Amino acid sequence: MFDVQREELIWGDRKLVLETGKTARQADGAVVATYGETTVLATVVAAKEPKAGIDFMPLTVNYQERAYAAGRIPGGYFKREGRPSEKETLVSRLIDRPIRPLFVEGWRNDTQVVVTVLSHDLENDPDIVSMVAASAALTLSGVPFMGPIGAARVGYLNGGYKLNPLVTEVAESTLDLVVAGTQDAVLMVESEAKELSEDVMLGAVMFGHKHFQPVIEAIIRLAEKAAKEPRDFSPPENADVEKAVLDICESELRDAYKITVKQDRYKAVDAVKAKVVAALCPAEGEQKFSPEKVKAAFKEAQSKVVRWNILDTGSRIDGRDVKTVRPIVSEVGVLPRAHGSSLFTRGETQALVVATLGTGEDEQFIDALEGTYKERFLLHYNFPPYSVGETGRMGSPGRREIGHGKLAWRAIRPVLPPAHEFPYTIRVVSEITESNGSSSMASVCGGSLSLMDAGVPLRRPVAGIAMGLILEGERFAVLSDILGDEDHLGDMDFKVAGTDEGITSLQMDIKIAGITEEIMRVALAQAKDGRAHILGEMAQALTAARPELGEYAPRIETMQIPTDKIRDVIGTGGKIIREIVEKTGAKINIEDTGVVKIASSDGKAIKAAYNWIRSIVAEPEAGTIYDGTIVKIMEFGAFVNFFGAKDGLVHISELAPQRVAKVGDVVKEGQKVKVKFLGADERGKIRLSMKVVDQETGEDITEKLKAERAERGEPEREERSDRGDRGDRGPRRDRGERRRESSGE
């Protein structure tokens, strides 16, 4: 029934198994990949006919995690998986980016790659396994895919590289890098690093490329046994139409691409395009070529004109040379009520970035396969259509916005202060108000400035720069701080962020079949120079965090209490903690370790809450005299609030030196008194005395009373440790039960 084919190999000290022929047999390609005990299913389905009227390759990648993979039931009301999580979106992009350039040019059939996590051992992250499985499924499917690709995660531990580190090892590593590529070249890099050098980063990329070669070889062996017949597809011949278009528009396109203002340049290019379409696709008469082919050829002509000009003259669209960064203006404190804000402008790219500080209550709960955890640093990136002078959809963030936000998050996170030094939840929001290339890196620069404006003590300022590439045969040019057109018409988008000490984040997307180590080395060196220049420009606004938090930011006071006192601070059903919050106005967060965080923008509120909690957890000293207030009168004595929130009992025998017949004859509720703390009994009940304290002066008169008794010839009274408990007895029926128990009934 099943024609199962398998390939196994030991990879990074663990077994990798690729299997096909048993699961999802109606898909064009299906592979189950298992690494350790993490298992994913990757499927590929491509439409039988091309999609009409489009000039792009319609590829969709969906990565989905199932809660059962980790033996969990989803949270929420419906108890089933819902919209994609942030991680699912990011891994979908991670799979998409290295495979998209490898489809044959002109492929217009809807193609969908679906990767489902079936089992997760909580040690091997499913993302690398998913990339490998997707590559294998595409290679088997028969679609025109020039793969396979391999992928690997690289860590940097104790001065050495680690292939596919476990989840626990990644947390300890100074590098988390994912690299993907073919046998010959690197296609994609995604990483977060703790200020590592360019040499270490490049070494990690090449280390990963070398060590995923056995995976590519295993996929090839599997394809030799199980691949389907290749689709009958030939790339369209467009040489004639491309020549006709270029003959008409080359000169005018060159002139249009000398216009430095983006909107004016776009108008000029659109005018040239309209002229070409009118010439080759007239409304009346014979059309030499279809409008779709002419428009596609015009796009190719745009690319050729821009690329030739850069390679031949070294001059770019806006007149810069390949290494020059656009003019930069950095401003901070631009929003009066925000905790921290900045407006970062680089050429025609602009980001308004705002930092907000919160308490532990504001941390984000993330429900992942590994379990639920809290995240204290959030970075959100918004790209409204007006930023490029267009109308468009508004609403929840798309994949691009989530991906760009995560890239900026990775760039800034390594320089944040640890939570025990700066116990705030931090949210950064980047509003892209203008865009002409590299808006994610503008978010990094603006985010760094806004955090320093808010008083967040970053280890060092962070800047980011986007590098581009023009590659024609043996000739290439690496471009610093690329424009949007250079991104669209070029071969690479290589983003590098870091401090003056090293790289914190690196992302590379290649639109061709890969780049060499030499090109990456040149790009990293050029990016380092550009990053240093940008940091210098940012320093004109701020060089370090402000010494004080923003005027409207909350202040947080941290205190440590004994863990056995947490219950006392919270109270029954949260009664006490709610009362503290309501009366002081402060926010309070108590951790299981006994760490208490008190937050408010009002210093007096923090002090009041701090003293209140301290009074609950602090212990009075035996023999010490305290001021107190009568809070309740009983037949057997009076309860006194005497030590912050602590109450204790003054037994009727301890109210006055003389015999007291009725408690109300001596004290009234609300009366201010002075009491001596006698201690606590074995049940923790607090015993107090008024009779041994001079209520006028607060003096301890114990010895004076002893002397008076001695003069009267009265015997010395022995202190009874349980006298304070006599009035705390239960109802008569309870006492009767105790007597019956003692008599053996």
From Swiss-Prot:
As recorded in UniProt, its EC number(s) are 2.7.7.8
Q: Which reaction does it catalyse?
A: RNA(n+1) + phosphate = RNA(n) + a ribonucleoside 5'-diphosphate
Q: Where is this region: Disordered?
A: 695-745
KH domain spans which residues?
554-613
PROSITE patterns xrefs: KH_TYPE_1 (PS50084), S1 (PS50126)
Query: Which SMART domains does this one have?
Result: KH (SM00322), S1 (SM00316)
- Where is Mg(2+) bound in this sequence? D487, D493
Q: Where is the composition biased (Basic and acidic residues)?
A: 701-745
Would the keyword Nucleotidyltransferase turn up in this protein's UniProt record? yes
A cellular component term from Gene Ontology for this protein is: cytosol
Instruction: For this UniProt record, give its keywords in alphabetical order, as a comma-separated list.
Output: Cytoplasm, Magnesium, Metal-binding, Nucleotidyltransferase, RNA-binding, Transferase
The S1 motif domain extends over 623-691
Top EC class per UniProt?
A: transferase
Which biological processes are named by the entry's GO terms?
A: mRNA catabolic process; RNA processing
- State the compartments where it is located: Cytoplasm
Alphabetized Gene3D superfamilies for the sequence:
GHMP Kinase, N-terminal domain, K Homology domain, type 1, Nucleic acid-binding proteins
What is the predominant subcellular site recorded for this chain?
A: cytoplasm
NCBIfam families referenced in this protein's UniProt entry, alphabetically? polynuc_phos (TIGR03591), PRK11824.1 (NF008805)
What this chain does, per the record? Involved in mRNA degradation. Catalyzes the phosphorolysis of single-stranded polyribonucleotides processively in the 3'- to 5'-direction.
* Record-linked PANTHER family: POLYRIBONUCLEOTIDE NUCLEOTIDYLTRANSFERASE, POLYRIBONUCLEOTIDE NUCLEOTIDYLTRANSFERASE 1, MITOCHONDRIAL
Name the family the entry cites: Belongs to the polyribonucleotide nucleotidyltransferase family.
Q: What is this protein called?
A: Polyribonucleotide nucleotidyltransferase
This chain's source organism reads: Methylorubrum populi (strain ATCC BAA-705 / NCIMB 13946 / BJ001)
